[in-house]
Amino acid sequence: TAMSVPVSEVGKHFSNEKRTVATGIVTAAASVGYFLAPLFTQYTLGTVGWEHTLKYFMYFILFGLITSLFILPKKQVSVLKTEKSQNFTDAMKEAFSHKGYVLLVAGFFVCGFQITLVGTHVPGYMQDRGLGGWTATIILSLIGLFNIIGTLGIGYLGTKYSKKVLLSILYFLRAIIIAIFIFSPPSIYMSIFFGITFGLLWLSTVPPTNGIVAQIFGTKYLSTLFGIVFFSHQIGAFAGSFLGGYFYDLYGSYDYAWYIAIALSIFATLVHLPIDEKPIARVVRQA
């Protein structure tokens, strides 16, 4: 949830040509933590217990809180300056009257659904398929490790190609990878394949999504507008976590949750294509 704040804060300080690279670096830094957290948690739970594990994570949170105090507002780049007369209400009306923004909000729901379904239910899913707990740890750690590469790569590609097309490709690839994962015989090799390939796509949706919002509306209300998009992501995260457990309790299997994840990927692939990425007239006049 907190990641939307530094991503938007960094995004305010870069032009459209460089923004996805900058936000890709921020997202990659988050992935370093995601790579280390499963390994660290698995180790500390086995050596010092859950009480000390929670205490260690409290220290990490305090570290993040302290460092956040040093994030000071700086002057935004002039080419991204929006009309000073625009207030919050006008910005919200403008955004929700833009079809592309509504589609972006809908599409990011899918990202939240998928990554939380994987992050929450892969451990149980792997045990159901006869593989040990360390297999899930390996998958989640590989996801974090390779997402560093994925977010940096998509950040660079976002400076060269259409961001909406990149998002459609990312979601389409997710559908293929999930299908291969659930329909293939369970093995450590397939688990490694899934961790690597899904990791490349894990948070790679963040830089182009943030970039589209800033590109269309400017950066004055970027944190708020991207925060709303991210709120949709978190609703999807709730749905992915809840439905995974619900279907398992109902049918004794995660299969239906995976089927929904694949269907949502196809939906997201299509829903991003009609987005008009061009800056609105107000932003063009101010550039």
Model-derived regions: residue spans:
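Cytoplasmic helix-loop-helix junction between adjacent transmembrane helices
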Residues: T1-A28
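Paired intracellular helix-loop junctions of major facilitator superfamily
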Residues: V10-T20, V213-L222, G252
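Glycine-rich segments within core transmembrane alpha-helices of 12-TM secondary carriers
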Residues: R19-P38, G227-G240
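Flexible cytoplasmic inter-helical loops of multi-pass small-molecule transporters
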Residues: P73-D90, A281-A287
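Extracytoplasmic gate region of multi-pass secondary transporters
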Residues: H98-I154
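C-terminal transmembrane helical hairpin of 12-TM major facilitator-type secondary transporters
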Residues: I143, K160-I212
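Helix-to-loop junctions at the C-terminal end of transmembrane segments
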Residues: T151-S162, D249
